[in-house]
Amino acid sequence: ISTIRRVIARLLFEGEGKQLLNGTNDIYNEYVVAPFRVAVVRAEVYNSLQLQKAANYVSDVYENVFVYIEEQYACLLFTDIHTEECREKICKVMDNMCEKYKLLCCLSGSFNEIELIDKKRFMCQKALEIAHEQEPDKRSFREEDYYVQIVCSCALPYIGHARYLERELTELASEDEAKETKFYETLKQYLLVGNNVSMAAKKMFIHRNTMIYRLSKINEILGVDINEPGIAHKILISILLQEQEKEEK
């Protein structure tokens, strides 16, 4: 990794992108070319040497990348992503890196504004925490797949228990515990797959007819139509907020 790329990476990831733009415009125009993507990489057990090896691997196979390593994370900024071939190559490189070095990674979507680098890094870090908790067997994740969960995790301190159908959802979970039913998890999986009965049944490892029966009972218990899009979205957000609260406790 060249010295100039290290310097630019430090400026960009330490929030001095505008200063870089104003002070060294020629260098900026030559090296930092939109569109961008950010990737955040970490080890399951902190290992700085492993992170550095992984960063070197990415730099060797993909030229237009800036690498910044801080504490337990390696932050990567991919630049000049103008073709579908580039986008696919980045995904493949990061997936291969995760497997080769046994690391966890989250990759952001494309963006053009340099001011968004820090926010994209934050969102990737959040997505990585959430995704690894939900899918511990996976190593490579995409920020956009966890957008709702990221937003919920940020909103939790401000919303608290003032969530949509808070009492009803809590009672649903309590009934599951008392009667050993799985209505709460069934509802969550159903909403996560966009109210698709067959997909939800598959995720729950139950027959489609069993899923339909459970959903009808859930409708009765909650007293709302969970298939109405506006209601479904609000319930899903409430469930994600409740789960985020449990994880933080």
Residue map of PLM features:
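Cytosolic nucleotide-utilizing catalytic cores of signal-transduction proteins
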Residues: 1-249
